[in-house]
Amino acid sequence: MKELVNILDFLPEELGEKIKPMFRVKQIYQWIYQKYANNFSDMSSLPKDLRLELAQNFHFSPVKCVKNEQSKDGSIKYLFELIDGLRVESVLLPMKKEKINTEGKRISHARYTICVSSQVGCKSGCSFCLTAKGGLKRNLSTGEIVGQILWIKKQNNIPYERRVNIVYMGMGEPLDNLKNVSKAVKILAQNDGLAISPRRQTISTSGLAKQIKELGQMNLGVLLAISLHAVNDELRTELMPINKAYNIAAIMDAVREFPIDQRKRVMFEYLLIDGINDKLEHAKELVKLLNGIKAKVNLILFNPHEGSLYKRPSLENAIKFQDLLSNKGVTCTIRESKGLDISAACGQLKERAKEQ
């Protein structure tokens, strides 16, 4: 029996090499990404013989949702099973509620962020992250990355044209899977598809300096987020073993070379861990480290998970840390940890066992 190929792996020009004429590729993209077709037989504007040809050669269901949990704050965590039985988690984060005026008319739409996984597991070994506990199983294909987003939008009846933000902050190190992640960015941005601008897609990394430079040279227009979490190499190596390969100086050099839109900033994620990296002296060092860089610091209070020895700091301490940065001219926010009650917050995702 012929093995079917995932059509979500293909850019339009790649499909155009297999399917003629090109306007049919445009129609196929629109059926999949805009009309949310369930199968090729739904694509009524295509000739019957083309629909049959597509069904004989392609599929577009590389991920299957086997479980979902909804948080009190409205966040939804999805457990997806892949074709080989491995599993990843993704999260839909409601960022802004729909607004209705006194006359019952909608004056603004709800806004969402989708946190997507790029690998099954992760090899970075960060001591505070649950994903790292199981190690790396494999990279996700481009279609498996795109499939998470497509399924979530379809399941929640989010029209294709409705703006969503994509953050590659789920399971895995995105830059360890740069080829497939960068292609996913391009596919998601297609005007005949989901039309998610690269400026609405943020790629997070633990600090792979070489790949940061490679990503910059691609000129995709994506936003960059650096998981920093410490201001000196000794502490960062303790928290993040990847620092042995790429120390803070190497990361900052790569960041300085990264092309950023004049209106945008590089995001630095800083996980505050009680008694470890949350002192005001750390905040002062962070100010020095970011000198001369268009940066925004995103403070995250540590999210507890099974087996962790770290503690979550008080909000009071986090605000003091934030105030010091802000008073020194560093743009800084404290991230609200959405989905904490369903283990969907930062550092809490993992490959859940099949018995679940």
Swiss-Prot record:
Cofactor note: Binds 1 [4Fe-4S] cluster. The cluster is coordinated with 3 cysteines and an exchangeable S-adenosyl-L-methionine.
Taxonomic superkingdom: Bacteria
Listed EC numbers: 2.1.1.192
Reaction catalysis annotation: adenosine(2503) in 23S rRNA + 2 reduced [2Fe-2S]-[ferredoxin] + 2 S-adenosyl-L-methionine = 2-methyladenosine(2503) in 23S rRNA + 5'-deoxyadenosine + L-methionine + 2 oxidized [2Fe-2S]-[ferredoxin] + S-adenosyl-L-homocysteine; adenosine(37) in tRNA + 2 reduced [2Fe-2S]-[ferredoxin] + 2 S-adenosyl-L-methionine = 2-methyladenosine(37) in tRNA + 5'-deoxyadenosine + L-methionine + 2 oxidized [2Fe-2S]-[ferredoxin] + S-adenosyl-L-homocysteine
Key words of the record: 4Fe-4S, Cytoplasm, Disulfide bond, Iron, Iron-sulfur, Metal-binding, Methyltransferase, rRNA processing, S-adenosyl-L-methionine, Transferase, tRNA processing
Principal subcellular localization: cytoplasm
Disulfide pairings: C115-C346
Residues annotated to bind [4Fe-4S] cluster: C122, C126, C129
Domain Radical SAM core: residue ranges: 108-341
Chain residues that bind S-adenosyl-L-methionine: G172, E173, S204, S227, L228, H229, N303
InterPro entries xref list: Aldolase_TIM, Elp3/MiaA/NifB-like_rSAM, Methyltransferase_A, RlmN_N, RNA_MTrfase_RlmN, rRNA_lsu_MTrfase_RlmN/Cfr, rSAM
Protein's UniProt keywords contain Methyltransferase: yes
Active site: E89 (proton acceptor), C346 (s-methylcysteine intermediate)
Entry-linked PANTHER family: 23S RRNA METHYLTRANSFERASE, RADICAL SAM CORE DOMAIN-CONTAINING PROTEIN
Further comment found in the protein's record: Reaction proceeds by a ping-pong mechanism involving intermediate methylation of a conserved cysteine residue.
Purpose of the protein: Specifically methylates position 2 of adenine 2503 in 23S rRNA and position 2 of adenine 37 in tRNAs. m2A2503 modification seems to play a crucial role in the proofreading step occurring at the peptidyl transferase center and thus would serve to optimize ribosomal fidelity.
Protein family (similarity comment): Belongs to the radical SAM superfamily. RlmN family.
Protein name as it appears in the record: Dual-specificity RNA methyltransferase RlmN
Organism: Campylobacter jejuni subsp. jejuni serotype O:23/36 (strain 81-176)
Organism classification: Bacteria, Pseudomonadati, Campylobacterota, Epsilonproteobacteria, Campylobacterales
